[in-house]
């Protein structure tokens, strides 16, 4: 399974902010580290998030809730989740509106 690294997510965030607007920068490096590694937590030698989809959901959720960046946390949470799925061979076929409603709603 391929993982996204912290430097990759920071680069994605900077590109996203440049394209969509907002303030670039990390607000809390520890919260970023926590968010990026949360999908790979183990308990008793077993992954807490067993499926690729569960890991992707946890990555997106953690980036949104931990708020590690100054701005654009919801945007990077969704983008990181989609990229994580894609690099692992899963491409979503939902509409942009579905994504927005599920992320914000």
Please identify what each model-predicted range represents:
Residues 1-105:
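FIC/Doc superfamily catalytic core
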């Amino acid at each position: 399974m391929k993982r996204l690294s912290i430097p990759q997510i920071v680069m994605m965030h900077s590109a996203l902010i440049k394209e969509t607007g907002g303030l670039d920068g990390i607000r809390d490096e520890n919260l970023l580290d926590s968010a990026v590694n949360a999908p790979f937590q183990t308990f008793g030698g077993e992954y807490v998030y067993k499926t690729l989809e569960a890991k992707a959901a946890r990555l997106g959720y953690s980036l949104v809730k931990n708020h590690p960046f100054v701005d654009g946390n919801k945007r990077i949470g969704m983008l990181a989740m989609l990229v994580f799925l894609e690099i692992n061979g899963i491409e979503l076929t939902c509409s942009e509106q579905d994504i927005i409603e599920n992320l914000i709603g």
